[in-house]
């Protein structure tokens, strides 16, 4: 249905603060947030654009693999301060996935101002910054020319 409607699917991936430290994790089962589960969806629905929400900790490399392998999978960088991004994620932002990484803050848990200030300190190539911060999302959401 989502694919037929031309909409975008977003899946939360990786550890969440919801339920963290609570008895039984508040019932949240982290295994369902492994981005490898989305690989099946991306293969079965190749015309469905999919966003993996968050850097997918502790499965960041799996998320990078899925987004690299499946042309319809993107990663939003919300939910974690960029100062905690591992080197491999920064490498992929600058190279293989430069056109598939999306800005996100996860407000109100992380304010856009804080996320942007931390992102500014990363070793992100100058030509890649506008892709992550605006142009990739504008293209994905078909918002016209990213000006």
Can you say where each PLM-predicted feature lies in the sequence?
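Conserved, mostly hydrophobic/aromatic
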Residues: 2, 54, 75, 106, ...
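Short glycine-enriched loops at secondary-structure junctions
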Residues: 57, 108-109
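Catalytic pocket-lining loop regions of alpha/beta-barrel enzymes
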Residues: 1-102
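Short, flexible micro-motifs
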Residues: 82, 107-108
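Mid-to-C-terminal alpha-helical segments outside catalytic/metal-binding sites
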Residues: 97-102, 110-147
């Amino acid at each position: 249905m989502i694919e037929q409607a031309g909409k975008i699917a977003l899946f939360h991936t990786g550890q969440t603060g919801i339920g963290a430290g609570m008895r039984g994790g508040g019932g949240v089962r982290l295994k369902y947030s492994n981005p490898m589960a989305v690989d099946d969806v991306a293969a079965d629905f190749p015309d469905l654009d999919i966003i993996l929400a968050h850097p997918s900790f502790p499965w960041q490399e799996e998320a990078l693999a899925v987004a690299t392998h499946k042309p319809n999978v993107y990663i939003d960088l919300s939910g974690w301060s960029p100062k905690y991004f591992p080197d491999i994620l920064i490498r992929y932002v600058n190279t293989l996935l430069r056109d598939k990484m999306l800005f996100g803050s996860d407000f109100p848990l992380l304010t856009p101002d804080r996320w942007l200030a931390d992102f500014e300190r990363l070793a992100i190539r100058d030509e890649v910054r506008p892709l992550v911060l605006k142009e990739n999302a504008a293209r994905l959401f078909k918002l016209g020319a990213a000006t």
